[in-house]
Amino acid sequence: MSNNFKDDFEKNRQSIDTNSHQDHTEDVEKDQSELEHQDTIENTEQQFPPRNAQRRKRRRDLATNHNKQVHNESQTSEDNVQNEAGTIDDRQVESSHSTESQEPSHQDSTPQHEEGYYNKNAFAMDKSHPEPIEDNDKHETIKEAENNTEHSTVSDKSEAEQSQQPKPYFATGANQANTSKDKHDDVTVKQDKDESKDHHSGKKGAAIGAGTAGVAGAAGAMGVSKAKKHSNDAQNKSNSGKVNNSTEDKASEDKSKEHHNGKKGAAIGAGTAGLAGGAASNSASAASKPHASNNASQNNDEHDHHDRDKERKKGGMAKVLLPLIAAVLIIGALAIFGGMALNNHNNGTKENKIANTNKNNADESKDKDTSKDASKDKSKSTDSDKSKDDQDKATKDESDNDQNNANQANNQAQNNQNQQQANQNQQQQQQRQGGGQRHTVNGQENLYRIAIQYYGSGSPENVEKIRRANGLSGNNIRNGQQIVIP
């Protein structure tokens, strides 16, 4: 017993199982307890592998669980195919020859040998993987489990051979042809159904089809999967998962090639030939006539399948074209209704424009009439105002003329009065002077000339005399004025 902490820690680590693997937890725990017990006893001198090995092992276990689910689904389809193959073998004519009891066992030993070969190859691939080996005792335990599995498989197969051994039946060529033809028709119908399911379900359908084709060659192996479920350990589960993965990948690649190349009929014929060969290998006499009838029926089925594909394509084109035509018709109707609506809208807008223009013209004519009436009224008012102003002016002129006439009359009367007053003053002055001469001013006479006329000299003294005599202060005298000359 080692005291290394790392060894104890790694030994106590447990793998993580998924929920779908809970039904086998008891078997796994028993196997793990046995392996741990052996590890603690015999692994004391061995270098323990690194931690990454445990992680890789857990990944393989998870992949094994996932592949086991797919394998279980394919196993159910295998059982159904085996049951159908058993019914076909009962109807087939093979018991007339002496080698009937030997050939089925030889045939059934072939799948056993192939299965052991797959398990051994998978185990060898796992051993050749660059991952470190955990311990030698674990591999020894795995080998022992494989041997037990092989022995249990052999026993189960022998029982299945005895149960499925065909009954003695005398066959003719016609019976063999009819039997193989019926069998071929059944297999063709089933493969058509399987192919349609594979086309719609993807990888799951491809795995089921691959399992069906693989089991068709080994129609007598009834109890293989049940023995594997209860006796194989984790290594056998991983190996079977790898084998199933390889078959699934191969089947999926074949399906993809068939789907892209349009050769589904050939694939159906190949699967039918494999199934018929696996079911008819129990007899050595059915080698020539059944194969010929199978080939003829296979060709007919291929032609029928191609015709069905053409009909499907035509139906698919019709399904594609009908919605397109309906969409085009709907769009055309919408376009027509839209054009009519736009046309009506345009007509309505034109009518509205015409009505608006007519209304605007009527409004403009009304405005013009009102403006003309206003201008007439204004001209009339201006004319009346002018005439009134003229009348006022005329009356004013008349009043001014009357007033001027009155003023002139007053002025004339005042002038007359002044003249009379001046005459009176002059008379009074003449009376005061007495006998002096009087001179009436005429034309342009002045005091200087009057002094020269009367005194012979126009000296200032003479002029001053005349002034004093007449009471003048200046030289201004007027026409018609009488001057006293002293």
From Swiss-Prot:
<keyword id="KW-1133">Transmembrane helix</keyword>
<feature type="region of interest" description="Disordered">
    <location>
        <begin position="351"/>
        <end position="440"/>
    </location>
</feature>
<feature type="compositionally biased region" description="Basic and acidic residues">
    <location>
        <begin position="126"/>
        <end position="160"/>
    </location>
</feature>
<feature type="compositionally biased region" description="Low complexity">
    <location>
        <begin position="204"/>
        <end position="225"/>
    </location>
</feature>
<feature type="compositionally biased region" description="Basic and acidic residues">
    <location>
        <begin position="247"/>
        <end position="259"/>
    </location>
</feature>
<feature type="region of interest" description="Elastin-binding">
    <location>
        <begin position="14"/>
        <end position="34"/>
    </location>
</feature>
<keyword id="KW-1003">Cell membrane</keyword>
<dbReference type="InterPro" id="IPR018392">
    <property type="entry name" value="LysM_dom"/>
</dbReference>
<feature type="topological domain" description="Cytoplasmic">
    <location>
        <begin position="226"/>
        <end position="319"/>
    </location>
</feature>
<feature type="transmembrane region" description="Helical">
    <location>
        <begin position="205"/>
        <end position="225"/>
    </location>
</feature>
<feature type="compositionally biased region" description="Basic and acidic residues">
    <location>
        <begin position="1"/>
        <end position="40"/>
    </location>
</feature>
<feature type="compositionally biased region" description="Low complexity">
    <location>
        <begin position="403"/>
        <end position="431"/>
    </location>
</feature>
<feature type="compositionally biased region" description="Basic and acidic residues">
    <location>
        <begin position="103"/>
        <end position="117"/>
    </location>
</feature>
<comment type="function">
    <text>Promotes binding of soluble elastin peptides and tropoelastin to S.aureus cells although it is not able to promote bacterial adherence to immobilized elastin and, therefore, is not a microbial surface component recognizing adhesive matrix molecule (MSCRAMM).</text>
</comment>
<feature type="compositionally biased region" description="Basic and acidic residues">
    <location>
        <begin position="361"/>
        <end position="398"/>
    </location>
</feature>
<dbReference type="InterPro" id="IPR036779">
    <property type="entry name" value="LysM_dom_sf"/>
</dbReference>
<dbReference type="GO" id="GO:0005886">
    <property type="term" value="C:plasma membrane"/>
</dbReference>
<feature type="compositionally biased region" description="Polar residues">
    <location>
        <begin position="64"/>
        <end position="85"/>
    </location>
</feature>
<feature type="compositionally biased region" description="Low complexity">
    <location>
        <begin position="278"/>
        <end position="297"/>
    </location>
</feature>
<protein>
    <recommendedName>
        <fullName>Elastin-binding protein EbpS</fullName>
    </recommendedName>
</protein>
<feature type="region of interest" description="Disordered">
    <location>
        <begin position="1"/>
        <end position="314"/>
    </location>
</feature>
<dbReference type="Pfam" id="PF01476">
    <property type="entry name" value="LysM"/>
</dbReference>
<feature type="transmembrane region" description="Helical">
    <location>
        <begin position="320"/>
        <end position="340"/>
    </location>
</feature>
<keyword id="KW-0472">Membrane</keyword>
<feature type="compositionally biased region" description="Basic and acidic residues">
    <location>
        <begin position="300"/>
        <end position="314"/>
    </location>
</feature>
<feature type="topological domain" description="Extracellular">
    <location>
        <begin position="341"/>
        <end position="486"/>
    </location>
</feature>
<feature type="compositionally biased region" description="Basic and acidic residues">
    <location>
        <begin position="180"/>
        <end position="199"/>
    </location>
</feature>
<feature type="domain" description="LysM">
    <location>
        <begin position="437"/>
        <end position="485"/>
    </location>
</feature>
<feature type="compositionally biased region" description="Polar residues">
    <location>
        <begin position="233"/>
        <end position="246"/>
    </location>
</feature>
<keyword id="KW-0812">Transmembrane</keyword>
<feature type="topological domain" description="Extracellular">
    <location>
        <begin position="2"/>
        <end position="204"/>
    </location>
</feature>
